[in-house]
Amino acid sequence: MPRNDTVRALDWQGDHLKLLDQRRLPAETVWLDCHSAADTADAIRDMVVRGAPAIGIAAAYGVVLAARAAMARRPADWPAAMAADLARLRSARPTAVNLFWALDRMQQVVDSDPADPLAALEAAAVAIHEDDLTANRRMGELGAHLIPAGAGVLTHCNTGSLATGGYGTALGVIRSAWSGKGLSAVYADETRPWLQGARLTAWELVADGIPVRLIAEGAAPLLMQRGRVDWVIVGADRVAANGDTANKIGTYALALACKAHGVKFMVVAPSSTIDLDCPGGDRIPIEERPPEELLWLGDRRVAAEGAGAWNPVFDVTPAELIDVLVTERGVVTDFGGAGVRALING
């Protein structure tokens, strides 16, 4: 399959998983080797790898590593022997539903009692990885079709190759729109506190030769007020059955600003991110990370000594603020009734 992106976040080596350490970007390109499920779970928790699809893919490979270790320790009852490793993977990040989807899919392989379990598990993990890339390219096409030539777009966080199996979700739409119709401007907000927009999205777009302008998150409404943005395009970590969408903190504020200024708001997510067992956004668990991530920037404290911090890293955008949900199976523009459910089950 031809590539239109120059970056990959995961590389399966057959006996271990290599992860591009996204905490070190863009200053350093460092790969971390994961030789066990524990290594993989720690990398997910510590945000070496991030982005819902990439987390799911990494977890799938983590199951392969868990199975290999369990078979070496207790070949007669290896499925039971890997239970602790699977629990550790499952608890690594609470909001990204792709993690649980991938682990459930790998568990189905274990439960099927294949003749060659390791080969079957590895094939399943590779399929999850490859299917994600295929889905991203399809979403790129579907989303780009909705964006007129010469439009200005703004994206939030990082939803590109670094967050997925390749190409990206929201950033995949931007890649497709740029190469197909052309865009007047591509803006990325910095995305505090981990600066995924400044560090990762800008890095990906520059590497691909797509001009990008960085803005502070608080500048987004002014950008809309001045008519420079026609679409805000974001990814998702979990989409509820009613269309409510959990994504990186700050997404909800962008959606409210879009509604105030008549700017279109697009969510781009593979079907693996849709949780039909979750009826609405109020049921989505919101991860809160250590306050130090707000109080410090790298190794330097930026907040006054004695100040505390509240650090939720996701918020929920109600479906009524979303103009379109793009998946590899099609698009949803009407979230009433069975809109999302019909797309997935149809």
Curated annotation (Swiss-Prot):
Keywords in alphabetical order: Amino-acid biosynthesis, Isomerase, Methionine biosynthesis
InterPro entries the UniProt entry points to: IF-2B-related (IPR000649), IF-M1Pi (IPR005251), IF_2B-like_C (IPR042529), Initiation_fac_2B_a/b/d (IPR011559), M1Pi_N (IPR027363), NagB/RpiA_transferase-like (IPR037171)
Domain of life of the organism encoding this protein: Bacteria
Keyword Protein biosynthesis attributed: no
Entry's Gene Ontology molecular function annotations: S-methyl-5-thioribose-1-phosphate isomerase activity
Pathway(s) served: Amino-acid biosynthesis; L-methionine biosynthesis via salvage pathway; L-methionine from S-methyl-5-thio-alpha-D-ribose 1-phosphate: step 1/6
Enzyme class: isomerase
Catalytic activity: 5-(methylsulfanyl)-alpha-D-ribose 1-phosphate = 5-(methylsulfanyl)-D-ribulose 1-phosphate
A UniProt-annotated Pfam family: IF-2B
Biological process according to GO: L-methionine salvage from methylthioadenosine
EC numbers: 5.3.1.23
Marked site positions, Transition state stabilizer: C157
Residues involved in substrate binding: R50, G51, A52, R93, Q196, N247, K248
UniProt-annotated catalytic positions: D237
Keyword Flavoprotein among record annotations: no
Family per record: Belongs to the eIF-2B alpha/beta/delta subunits family. MtnA subfamily.
UniProt function note: Catalyzes the interconversion of methylthioribose-1-phosphate (MTR-1-P) into methylthioribulose-1-phosphate (MTRu-1-P).
HAMAP family, per database record: Salvage_MtnA
Protein's name according to its UniProt entry: Methylthioribose-1-phosphate isomerase
Organism of this sequence: Alkalilimnicola ehrlichii (strain ATCC BAA-1101 / DSM 17681 / MLHE-1)
Phylogenetic placement of the source organism: Bacteria, Pseudomonadati, Pseudomonadota, Gammaproteobacteria, Chromatiales
